[in-house]
């Protein structure tokens, strides 16, 4: 569970049922550290080093932490994946291909009690103004 008091409160409210029937969930993690196209590529930009998931592998655990702790397992997943910068400096005076996903939006369905509820997960490395921004919205 994230240490942040707000995250713990959101978890407790959702778990207790006090917010009523849940109608929608949106959870995400955004940052903007990769907006600079002159930033050298690192291991997170190469499928050979981090797998094909890219932003999903890097940021997904933060977006999924509370929903999974609440037992909300995504089904019927529709993904929108984006590669913002297909090439970056390699840090050695050259350029290298970046073949991982920079941004990922997952639209899913979850089971909350007897109801199916839409859940959107957002993992973005390229989000202007974001500085390691984690959030969750549980609408009920």
Predicted regions and their residues:
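Contiguous beta-strand/loop segments that form the cofactor/metal-binding neighborhood of enzyme cores
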Residues: 64-140
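Predominantly a Rossmann-like dinucleotide-binding segment in NAD(P)-dependent oxidoreductases
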Residues: 2-98
């Amino acid at each position: 569970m994230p240490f942040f008091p707000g995250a713990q409160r959101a978890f407790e409210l959702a778990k207790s049922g006090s917010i009523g029937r849940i109608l929608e969930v949106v959870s995400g993690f955004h940052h903007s550290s990769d907006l600079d196209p002159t930033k050298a590529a690192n291991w997170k930009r190469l499928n050979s080093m981090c797998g094909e998931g890219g932003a999903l592998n890097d940021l997904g655990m933060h977006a999924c932490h509370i929903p999974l702790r609440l037992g909300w397992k995504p089904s019927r997943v529709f993904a929108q994946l984006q590669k913002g910068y297909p090439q970056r400096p390699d840090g050695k005076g050259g350029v290298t291909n970046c073949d991982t996903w920079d941004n990922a939006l997952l639209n899913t369905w979850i089971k909350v009690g007897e109801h199916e509820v839409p859940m959107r997960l957002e993992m973005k490395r390229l989000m202007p103004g974001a500085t390691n921004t984690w959030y969750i919205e549980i609408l009920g």
